[in-house]
Amino acid sequence: MLLLLLTVSCTMKFSKEVYGEGKILSVTASVFADSIDNPGVQLVDVRTPDEFAAGNIPGSVNIDVLTGHFGETAATMLDKAYTVAVYCRSGNRSKNAAKTLSMMGYNVVELDGGYNDWVKSYGDVK
């Protein structure tokens, strides 16, 4: 996990914020792609189930941030020992999810620009 954070911080420009115990890196689609290639990174799509079903990044799990129990669901599905990579449609919901996860003690990589930017760089994925 530390190696991932050091690699990202040394190779690309990103926005770094600290909330609670965890750290958040907000990164471009290309850096996000490199990040999720690392073993142990937990990939989370925080959009609605319908949005997720319409297309998602392979390997992601869906935890809808708009539900009233996002934190509880994340706590049962995610391991704090590993970085969590989050994305939504445009980057707004994933920023909120990243803040919540950070406050819970997770280290988070967030896709700035969301799935929309991912599709521009890598095409639509179903």
Regions found by a protein language model. Name each.
Residues Y87:
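Short, surface-exposed ligand- or partner-binding patches at beta-edge/loop junctions that are enriched
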Residues L43-D45:
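Structural scaffold elements adjacent to functional motifs in cytosolic proteins
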Residues M1-V8:
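Sec-dependent bacterial lipoprotein signal peptides
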Residues S9-S35, V41, D50-T83, N92-K126:
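Rhodanese-like catalytic fold shared by cysteine-dependent sulfurtransferases
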